[in-house]
Amino acid sequence: MEKTKLKIILLGDSGVGKTSLLKRYNDKDFKQLHNSTIYVDLVTKEICIAERQVILQIWDTAGQERFKSLPSRFYRDTDCCVLVYDVNTLKTFESIDNWHDEFIKQANPETPTKFPFVLMGNKTDVNNGKPRVVAKEIADQWCGSKGNIVYFETSAKAKINVEEAFLEIAKKALTNERQIDDMERYRSVVPTIEKETPRSRCSC
C-alpha cells in the first residue's frame, strides 16, 4: 500500500517547548534540559489514520529572531502549520501573530484563510501555583479571529494533550493534502474536456 507523506512545521519563539513536545510525541520521553534547535530539525513518524498509512515529516524550527526569515522553499508544500507558545510568557503569545503571518507570506497557500493551523499553548504544568499569564479565553479569542483555529493546551513534561494534539494535526494535514490532490486532478482534467468538446455549428 502506498504511504502518504505529510509535511508539518512547528513555529514559535525559542524556549516555548517545541522540541520537548516533539520528543514526547515521537520518543515518549521528556528531558528537562536539552540543546536548543540551531536551525531546523526533522522527525519522521509513521501512523495510521482512517485505515491509511501516513508518514509525518515534522519540522522543528529554531525560534530565535534571526531564524524568522527561513527561505521560502522551507515552507513550501506544508500540509499543516503548528504555532506554539508558552502559557506563562506573554511575549511568546504576542509573537504568534508574527509567526502566523510569516508562514502565510512565505508558504503562500492558495487559500490562506482555509489553510490548516493548530495552536498549542504549552507548559501548562509549570506555573508553580501562580496565576497563568495567558488565559485560555484569550487564546480562544485569537483562534476565533483567525477562522476558528483548533487550540490545545499541552504539557510535554506532564504528557497533557500531546498525543491528542498531534493526532488532530495529522488529520488536518491529511485533509489538506487530499484537497490539494483533488484541485490538481481537476486542473488537469478541465483543459482536456475543453479541448475535446466540439464547438456547435449552426446550420443555415
Swiss-Prot record:
Keyword entries, A-Z: Cell membrane, GTP-binding, Lipoprotein, Membrane, Methylation, Nucleotide-binding, Prenylation, Protein transport, Transport
Gene3D superfamilies in the record: P-loop containing nucleotide triphosphate hydrolases (3.40.50.300)
Amino acids binding GTP: 12-19, 60-64, 122-125, 155-156
Top-rank taxon: Eukaryota
One GO term of the biological process aspect: protein transport
Compartment(s) where it occurs, according to its Swiss-Prot or TrEMBL record: Cell membrane
One of the record's GO cellular component terms: plasma membrane
Stored InterPro entries: P-loop_NTPase (IPR027417), Small_GTP-bd (IPR005225), Small_GTPase (IPR001806)
SMART domains on file: RAB (SM00175), RAN (SM00176), RAS (SM00173), RHO (SM00174)
The keyword Cell membrane is assigned to this record: yes
Lipidation (S-geranylgeranyl cysteine): C202, C204
Motif (Effector region): 34-42
Example GO molecular function: GTP binding
Membrane topology, from the record: Lipid-anchor
List of residues that carry Cysteine methyl ester: C204
NCBIfam families named in the record: small_GTP
Known function: Intracellular vesicle trafficking and protein transport.
Family in the record: Belongs to the small GTPase superfamily. Rab family.
The name this protein goes by in its record: Ras-related protein RABG1
Provenance organism: Arabidopsis thaliana (Mouse-ear cress)
Gene that encodes the chain: RABG1
